[in-house]
A protein has these predicted regions:
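Positively charged n-region of N-terminal signal peptides that target proteins for export
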Residues: 1-6
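Bacterial N-terminal signal peptides
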Residues: 7-17
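Accessory carbohydrate-recognition regions in carbohydrate-active enzymes
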Residues: 22-193
Length: 193
């Protein structure tokens, strides 16, 4: 009888421990700070990502040099835009494909060369799977998230006027110069604007 009682007690304790571990598993992400390693030469990006996902949308400060190999440095004063692919912590520049930069109001022309914006650091936040920031100069709040294969951008325009989204196909996180896109075309469906 004694061994049966001990076995039942051990089984009950194992079930309680398993249930407790399973219940607490989802709460562990509250301990994650995606900004750790984003300054200096940590080569980490606060991009939104899921484990083993194909995309990681996040901010890019620059596309040049070893110190910016993730595309992001916390102390950099401006954001160039938001690209859809990043490698975090690798120490070598790669990806940074298809940079997007939203703005409200008439800001850019065909002759414009600087599309960057200063982020409001008080509004910049990241948690596993989500990145957010406000760009006051561009009149937009940016929210990025990811699924296994899709980068999702949401832009909330805080200023009236003309809304623009720059799509930069030449941007990429690489060492050196040279063409990244050698041939491209674009068209606008006149019926849809």
């Amino acid at each position: 009888m004694k061994p049966l009682a001990l076995n039942l007690l051990a089984l009950a304790l194992a079930l309680v421990a398993t249930a407790s571990a399973a219940a607490g598993r989802g709460e562990l992400t509250r301990f994650v700070n995606p900004f750790i390693g984003t300054d200096g030469t940590g080569h980490v990006t606060p991009a939104a990502m899921v484990p083993f996902g194909m995309v990681a949308p996040g901010p890019d400060n620059t596309d040049r040099g070893w110190s910016y190999s993730s595309g992001y440095q916390y102390r950099a004063p401006r954001i160039l835009g938001f690209s859809n692919t990043h490698i975090s912590g690798a120490g070598i520049p790669e990806l940074g494909d298809v940079l997007l930069m939203p703005a409200a109001g008439t800001r850019w022309s065909a002759q414009s060369t600087d599309f960057s914006a200063a982020p409001d650091k008080k509004t910049e936040s990241a948690k596993p799977g989500v990145y957010r920031v406000t760009l006051p100069g561009h009149g937009v709040r940016v929210e990025l998230t990811a699924t296994q294969r899709v980068a999702v951008h949401r832009y909330t325009f805080t200023q009236g006027g003309r809304v623009q989204v720059l799509v930069d196909l030449q941007h990429g996180l690489l060492f050196g110069d040279g063409p990244r896109v050698t041939q491209a075309t674009s068209s606008v469906d006149e019926a849809r604007g």
